[in-house]
């Protein structure tokens, strides 16, 4: 059915460049590679999980290197180590414990608000310890190689975008229903059985829900790609936790400078943080970047981003998106946000696509 809905999804996999740039993802779909989160469960962690945070992070760094070596061996030999019965101190559980430590002085995102969310003190995101899911379904509107995508939409966000098109869930932390790790796993397993090629954690944004998502992987058993779909304003510690268990990254790259980001999304040091995290993701797995072209922001944002990507992430693909429309606060405060109070023009989109072509960026199959 999904190929009838999206014939371009089938065409995308006939493109050798798409296959090359998403090689491991395609192999997981074909059950010829193992999703990283499953391998993380097989790597023994030789430290009590009640050790100090400093000790746990030191072991995590060592285990991340061991995991990279394990992944290389498994991929080269096409051998999958089976789960070790009773292996409670494994690499995934170490990550879950560290995520709980972060939750107690919350710095999942680079706002680093420091709320003790383990005792339901609300963070900047207005979330306590529980996660809420607004919806979950097979999504046929994602990038062609990703559909059908098993999307799980989390409520709340760590950004304050004045133009947010999902503001009904991003600005309302009480939307949806409370779902714990086992519930997330049940949703993910059901989506995979229904034909999802990946489990797509999105929102809002998944960042404030990192602890729940990692804990859900304990209860997931299917060999299916784990996909992180985010604004990527993660702390470096969060990126370290995600690095070894996510196969594909679908990050936004919104702004080409810090000033536009602070004015329109209310975040500081945006370009420094997000460019750092894009490089970490690029070292970790396969990446499709999303860039939303915005009116009057081609020169200050679109072109600098495309130049940076071409120089630093040459093998990733970029979805150059023309879907911007003035929503949320922009709709009601047009004078204040006059620069983005209209849709993007065809001329602006042409400049973006021509720039991408000139820089050698591969964008058409995912745009």
Which residue stretches match the model-derived regions?
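Auxiliary Fe-S-binding modules of radical SAM enzymes
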Residues: 1-114, 282-287, 292-367
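Long, charge-rich boundary regions
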Residues: 136-179, 187-206
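Pocket-edge positions in alpha/beta enzyme catalytic cores
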Residues: 176, 266, 341-344
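Conserved AdoMet/S-adenosylmethionine-binding subsite of the radical SAM
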Residues: 181-338
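Flexible, active-site-adjacent loop/turn segments at secondary-structure boundaries
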Residues: 123, 131, 167, 262, ...
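N-terminal [4Fe-4S]-dependent radical SAM core
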Residues: 69-154, 167-173
């Amino acid at each position: 059915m999904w190929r009838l809905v999206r014939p371009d999804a089938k065409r995308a996999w006939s493109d050798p460049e798409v296959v090359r740039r998403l090689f491991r993802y395609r192999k997981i779909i074909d059950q010829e590679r193992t999703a990283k989160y499953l391998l993380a469960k097989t790597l023994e962690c030789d430290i009590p999980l009640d050790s100090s945070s400093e000790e746990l992070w030191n072991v995590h760094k060592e285990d991340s290197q061991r995991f990279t070596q394990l992944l290389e061996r498994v991929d080269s030999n096409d051998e999958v180590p089976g789960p070790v019965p009773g292996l409670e101190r494994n690499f995934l559980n170490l990550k879950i414990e560290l995520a709980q430590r972060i939750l107690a002085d919350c710095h999942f995102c680079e706002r680093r608000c420091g709320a003790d969310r383990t005792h339901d003190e609300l963070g900047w995101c207005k979330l306590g310890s529980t996660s809420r899911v607004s919806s979950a379904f097979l999504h046929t509107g994602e990038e062609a190689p990703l559909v059908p995508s098993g999307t799980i939409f989390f409520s709340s966000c760590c950004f304050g975008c004045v133009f947010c098109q999902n503001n009904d869930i991003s600005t309302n932390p009480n939307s949806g229903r409370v779902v714990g790790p086992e519930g997330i796993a049940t949703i993910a397993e059901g989506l995979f059985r229904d034909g999802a090629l990946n489990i797509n954690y999105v929102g809002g944004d998944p960042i404030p829900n990192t602890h729940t998502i990692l804990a859900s992987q304990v209860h997931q058993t299917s060999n299916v790609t784990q996909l992180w779909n985010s604004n990527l304003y993660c702390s470096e510690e969060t990126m370290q936790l995600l690095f070894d268990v996510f196969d594909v990254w679908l990050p936004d790259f919104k702004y080409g400078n810090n000033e536009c980001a602070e004015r329109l999304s209310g975040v500081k040091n945006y370009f420094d943080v997000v460019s750092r995290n894009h490089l970490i993701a690029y070292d970790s797995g396969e990446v499709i970047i999303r860039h939303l072209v915005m009116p009057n922001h081609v020169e200050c944002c679109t072109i600098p981003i495309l130049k940076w990507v071409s120089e630093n992430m040459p093998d990733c693909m970029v979805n150059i998106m023309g879907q911007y429309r003035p929503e949320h606060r922009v709709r009601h405060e047009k004078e204040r946000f006059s620069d983005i109070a209209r849709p993007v023009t065809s001329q602006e989109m042409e400049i973006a696509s021509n720039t991408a072509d000139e820089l050698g960026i591969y964008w058409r199959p995912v745009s």
